[in-house]
C-alpha cells in the first residue's frame, strides 16, 4: 500500500505517477460524493451566483454589468448548459498589482460572466467541503472568520490557562504562488467522483502555469482543502494537537511547554515539505503573556488589542481624508474591528466618538423608493409547484427586466427564507385581500398549476 507519507521519498519526475497510484487506492476504499453538478445547475444556485457577482452599483453600471443585467435569463441558461455538459472554459483574465498588509500581490481578474460560473460551482463545492474542515480553521468559510476564530482562541486561553502558556506561530511562504496543482487535484479527487465537476475544477486550478490564482474564487477552497488534508487533520487526528488554529496560510498552536511546541513545529515542517511548501523563517515559540499577534489583533488571556499597524493606518487615513462621507465609512470599518476587542478608549481617542452598539442607535434601513426589502434568494415560481410554503409578506409595483408592475412575494420553504416574482393578477388580488385581514399573514399554502385558454398555464394558491 502506497501512502501520502511516501511522497517525499520519491524523485520529482516520479511523483506524479505515485500521486495517481494513491488516488486509485483512495478511490477504491473511500466513499466519495457524486451528483454535485445537479446541485450546481439548480436555478436558485445559478441565480444566487449571478446576483452575488453583480452586487454593487459600480458593477451594475459597468459595460459588462449592463449587458449581463439586460440578458440575465439568457446568461443563466447558457452557463447552466455549459456547466451541465462540462464544456465551460475560462475565457482569460487580466492582472492587477495590489498591496495588502504591506505585501504586493498580483491579482488575476476574470470577466463577470466567468465569475458567475466559478461562483456557482464553488458555492456548492464549498458547502460540501466545509463539513470536512476542523472547527478551528476560518478563512473563506461561511459563518466563520477572523472574529469567530479569535473568540475560539480567547475561550481556550481562559478555560485552560495551564495548557496554553506558550504559542507557536507560523506562516507559509508565498502560499498561492507555490501550491502544487497536482496535489490540489489529488485532494479534490479524494472527495468528489463526478468527472464533469473534476474537469471544471481542474480548469480553475490550472488557470496559471504554476500555483493557484490569488483572485479566483475557487482558489480559496482549493487552498483550504489542501491544508485541511495535509496539515489540519494530520495534526488533530494523528498527533491529537488540541489547540491548533489556521486562517488561510497563517497558523497558531498553543501548548503547555516550549518543548511540546517545538516538536509540533517539526511535524508541521515535515508535512509542508511533502507538498513542496515552506514555512517562513519568522516563525517563533513564545510565552502567551507577550501577546499573540494574530488575525489583526494582539490576543492575551485577559484582554485583546488591535494590531499596532492597523491603528496607525486608520489614524493616517483619518488625517488625510477630508470627505465627510469617506470619513464615516472609515469610522464604520474601524468600529467593526474595535468592537471585537477591548478598545473603547482607543476608538474615542481616534474618532472623537463614544463606541455604541448598533442596537443602541435604534435605526433601520429606509429605502428611498419606499418599497419593502425581503431576505432570501430569488427562486423561480416553477420550483415551488407542489411544495408546502409559508407566505409571509409581499410588495407590488416592483420594476424588473420583465415588466414595470411586478409583485415580489416573501416566503419560507422548510424554514429557509426565499422570494419569488409574479405578474399574476389573481395572486396579486388574493394577497391584497389577505393583507386587509387582521391576522392574514403569514399563511400556509401550496402553489399549483392550472391550464386555461389554449394550453396556457397559470400558478395559483391552494
Each predicted region: which residue ranges?
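Non-catalytic, polymerase-adjacent accessory regions of viral genome-replication enzymes
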Residues: 1-77
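Active-site-proximal segment of RNA-dependent polymerases
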Residues: 3-4, 8-14, 32-37, 118, ...
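Right-hand nucleic-acid polymerase module
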Residues: 7-12, 110, 115, 119, ...
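Short, conserved non-catalytic motifs in the polymerase core
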Residues: 58-65, 91-118, 132-144, 204-225
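Conserved polymerase palm-domain catalytic core
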Residues: 75-78, 82-83, 92, 101, ...
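OB/S1-fold single-stranded nucleic-acid-binding modules
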Residues: 355-396
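Short nucleic-acid-contacting surface segments enriched for D/E, G, S/T with interspersed K/R
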Residues: 428-448
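OB-fold/S1-family single-stranded nucleic acid-binding modules
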Residues: 449-462
Amino acid at each position: 500500500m502506497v501512502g501520502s507519507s511516501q511522497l517525499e521519498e520519491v524523485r520529482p519526475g516520479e511523483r506524479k505517477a505515485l500521486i495517481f497510484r494513491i488516488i486509485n487506492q483512495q478511490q477504491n476504499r473511500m466513499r466519495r460524493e457524486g451528483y454535485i453538478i445537479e446541485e450546481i445547475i439548480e436555478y436558485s444556485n445559478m441565480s444566487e451566483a449571478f446576483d452575488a457577482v453583480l452586487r454593487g452599483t459600480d458593477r451594475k453600471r459597468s459595460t459588462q454589468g449592463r449587458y449581463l443585467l439586460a440578458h440575465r435569463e439568457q446568461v443563466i441558461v447558457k452557463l447552466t448548459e455549459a456547466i451541465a455538459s462540462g464544456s465551460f472554459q475560462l475565457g482569460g483574465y487580466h492582472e492587477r498589482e495590489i498591496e495588502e498588509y504591506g505585501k504586493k500581490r498580483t491579482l488575476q481578474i476574470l470577466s463577470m460572466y466567468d465569475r458567475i460560473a466559478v461562483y456557482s460551482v464553488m458555492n456548492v463545492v464549498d458547502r460540501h467541503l466545509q463539513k470536512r474542515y476542523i472547527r478551528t480553521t476560518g478563512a473563506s468559510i461561511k459563518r466563520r472568520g477572523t472574529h469567530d476564530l479569535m473568540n475560539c482562541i480567547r475561550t481556550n486561553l481562559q478555560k485552560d490557562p495551564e495548557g496554553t502558556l506558550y504559542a507557536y506561530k507560523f506562516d507559509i511562504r508565498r502560499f498561492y504562488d507555490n501550491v502544487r496543482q497536482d496535489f490540489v487535484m489529488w485532494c479534490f479527487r479524494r472527495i468528489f467522483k463526478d468527472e464533469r465537476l473534476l474537469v471544471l475544477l481542474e480548469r480553475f486550478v490550472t488557470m496559471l502555469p504554476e500555483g493557484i490564482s490569488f483572485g479566483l474564487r475557487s482558489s480559496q477552497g482549493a487552498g483550504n482543502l489542501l491544508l485541511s488534508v495535509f496539515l489540519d487533520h494530520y495534526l488533530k487526528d494523528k498527533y491529537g494537537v488540541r489547540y491548533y488554529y489556521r486562517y488561510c496560510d497563517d497558523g497558531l498552536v498553543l501548548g503547555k511547554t516550549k518543548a511540546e511546541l517545538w516538536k509540533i513545529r517539526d511535524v508541521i515542517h515535515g508535512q509542508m515539505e511533502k507538498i513542496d511548501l515552506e514555512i517562513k523563517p519568522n516563525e517563533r515559540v513564545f510565552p502567551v503573556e507577550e501577546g499573540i499577534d494574530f488575525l489583526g489583533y494582539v490576543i492575551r488571556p485577559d484582554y485583546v488589542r488591535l494590531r499596532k499597524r492597523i491603528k496607525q493606518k486608520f489614524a493616517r487615513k483619518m488625517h488625510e481624508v477630508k470627505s465627510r462621507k469617506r470619513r464615516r465609512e472609515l469610522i464604520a470599518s474601524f468600529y467593526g474591528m474595535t468592537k471585537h476587542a477591548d478598545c473603547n478608549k482607543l476608538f474615542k481617542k481616534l474618532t472623537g466618538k463614544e463606541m455604541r452598539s448598533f442596537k443602541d442607535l435604534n435605526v433601520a434601513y429606509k429605502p428611498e423608493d419606499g418599497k419593502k426589502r425581503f431576505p432570501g434568494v430569488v427562486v423561480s415560481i416553477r420550483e415551488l409547484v407542489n411544495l408546502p410554503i409559508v407566505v409571509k409578506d409581499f410588495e407590488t409595483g416592483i420594476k424588473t427586466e420583465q415588466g414595470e408592475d411586478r409583485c415580489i412575494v416573501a416566503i419560507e420553504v422548510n424554514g429557509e427564507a426565499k422570494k419569488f416574482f409574479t405578474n399574476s393578477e389573481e395572486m396579486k388580488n388574493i394577497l391584497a385581500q389577505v393583507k386587509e385581514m387582521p391576522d392574514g399573514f403569514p399563511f400556509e399554502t401550496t402553489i399549483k398549476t392550472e391550464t386555461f385558454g389554449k394550453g396556457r398555464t397559470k400558478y395559483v394558491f391552494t
